[in-house]
């Protein structure tokens, strides 16, 4: 009986009307990610308002963002690389192969945790200095990161395996895992930061305790009879072909996430030369960008299983319908929110700090920084669709184009001609250029991908 109900959850990915199905799958993930975003923003707000040290503490924690992103990006190899392949396998009726993707993904997350935590502890100070920490902000950065690293495994599991819950058509269960961590974090933050007077260490402790609860929820579901795709002992053995497939497809989301870390190193390093006030401004701007990027990530988590399942099932029309809806929603949402932030920079800045100098700095650089992001929804839709369709090489190129090929060189060159404004302008130029290139590439390749799918089905 339970198996029949679980199969019904999967089958709806290939039978329900596309528009309500996508929103049914995506809205729980968007809601969960939005609450998670709220936690991140509230976290920064609390830190920024710590008496006497708020501005420097905010800059210090902002420096750690690059390292935190780099560590958590390894979960994208498993979550964004393994879950779509598991969904394709389910669409093809191959449950054993789908189970292997889940089991091997779990083992990879443990391996990534050991390697990243060890490296971060051994080289913490030089990494933080490279990321832009000054003599003033370094102590706050070290306080936060030293505690955060204790919970790396919880972060990897909760983010890396949650997408496997989505891939079996259970978005509500996946939503709860994020909500549990985010809401608990919002409650614990002021308790540890202010009541126990732990400062930034309290913020980090609240984070890892909350992520531990999320990880427990994810594992509890995946090991239970409620899951149609279960985490089983027989699949906890590395399979070279399974791991290779995950790495091939997951490299693109990993690069997309980890290059955010590389960019953080470069931007913070460039801004530190102009003063800690600009490093603090960047921390606020990155949080503002999350208002758009995090809900889009949630929407992607909802539609990717739908696209992957129907691609594996060979349903050309449903794949096309899925993309039309995704492109419209992602572009519209992204454009409207970015335009509002560009028009009202003072509101954005004042939410994070009461420092008049920092508010004035954010007002000046925010329009320069976010201008190119107005059309970034195009890239998010196209790139995530490439991932959903298993197009690893194209996804890798797109991920490299925006950050490594465009942004890093621009962030190093433009300040020589435009001063500190050049650092912020580099983001806008790279975002707009990459979005246009990605969209053109997708509309060139998409018909070829669909023809290849039809040929495979016919043969």
Task: Describe each region flagged by the PLM.
Residues 24-43, 147, 181, 210-214, ...:
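Transmembrane helical elements of multi-pass membrane transporters/channels
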Residues 27, 43, 82, 123-124, ...:
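Hydrophobic/aromatic residues in alpha-helical transmembrane segments
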Residues 58-118, 155-174, 281-345, 376-395:
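Small-residue-rich hydrophobic transmembrane alpha-helices
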Residues 1-26, 86-151, 195-251, 307-372, ...:
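Short alpha-helical transmembrane segments in multi-pass integral membrane proteins
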Residues 13-53, 66-81, 85, 110-117, ...:
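N-terminal transmembrane alpha-helices
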Residues 148-166, 177-182, 203-216, 297-300, ...:
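Short runs within selected transmembrane alpha-helices of multi-pass transporters and secretion channels
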Residues 34, 38-59, 128-135, 191-198, ...:
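Helix-terminus/linker motif at the lipid-water interface of multi-pass membrane proteins
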Residues 32, 36, 40-47, 72-79, ...:
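Alpha-helical transmembrane segments and their lipid-water interface positions
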């Amino acid at each position: 009986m339970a198996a029949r109900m679980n199969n019904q959850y999967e089958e709806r990915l290939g039978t329900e009307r596309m528009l309500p199905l996508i929103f049914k799958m995506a809205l729980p993930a968007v809601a969960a990610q939005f609450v998670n975003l709220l936690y991140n923003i509230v976290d920064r707000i609390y830190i920024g308002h710590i008496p006497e040290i708020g501005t420097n503490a905010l800059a210090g924690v902002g420096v750690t963002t690059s390292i935190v992103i780099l560590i958590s990006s390894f979960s994208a190899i498993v979550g964004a690389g393994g879950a779509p392949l598991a969904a394709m396998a389910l669409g093809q009726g191959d449950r054993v192969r789908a189970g292997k993707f889940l089991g091997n993904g779990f083992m990879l997350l443990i391996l990534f945790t050991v390697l990243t935590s060890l490296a971060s502890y051994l080289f913490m100070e030089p990494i933080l200095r490279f990321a832009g920490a000054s003599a003033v902000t370094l102590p706050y950065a070290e306080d936060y990161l030293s505690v955060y690293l204790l919970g790396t495994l919880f972060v990897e599991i909760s983010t890396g395996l949650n997408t496997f819950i989505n891939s079996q058509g259970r978005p509500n269960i996946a939503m709860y895992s994020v909500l549990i961590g985010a809401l608990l974090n919002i409650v614990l933050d002021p308790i540890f930061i202010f009541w126990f007077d732990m400062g930034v260490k309290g913020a980090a402790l609240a984070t890892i305790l909350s992520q531990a609860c999320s990880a427990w929820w994810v594992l509890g579901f995946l090991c239970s009879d409620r899951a149609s795709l279960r985490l089983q002992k027989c699949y906890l053995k590395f399979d070279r072909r399974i791991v290779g497939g995950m790495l091939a497809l997951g490299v693109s989301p990993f690069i997309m996430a980890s290059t955010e870390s590389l960019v953080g190193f470069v931007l913070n390093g460039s801004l530190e030369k102009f003063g800690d006030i600009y490093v603090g401004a960047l921390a606020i701007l990155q949080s503002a960008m999350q208002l758009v990027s995090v809900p889009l990530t949630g929407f992607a988590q909802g539609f990717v299983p739908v696209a992957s399942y129907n691609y594996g099932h060979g349903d050309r029309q449903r794949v096309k319908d899925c993309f039309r809806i995704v492109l419209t929603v992602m572009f519209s949402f992204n454009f409207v929110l970015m335009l509002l932030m560009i028009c009202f920079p003072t509101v954005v800045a004042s939410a994070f700090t009461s420092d008049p100098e920092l508010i004035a700095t954010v007002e000046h650089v925010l329009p320069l920084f976010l201008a190119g992001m107005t059309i970034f929804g195009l890239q998010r839709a196209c790139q995530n669709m490439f991932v959903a369709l298993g197009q690893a090489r194209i996804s890798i190129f797109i991920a490299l184009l925006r950050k490594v090929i465009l942004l890093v060189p621009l962030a190093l060159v433009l300040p020589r001609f435009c001063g500190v404004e050049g650092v912020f302008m580099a983001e806008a130029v790279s975002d707009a250029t990459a979005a246009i290139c990605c969209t053109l590439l997708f509309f060139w390749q998409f018909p070829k991908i669909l023809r290849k799918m039809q040929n495979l089905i016919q043969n």
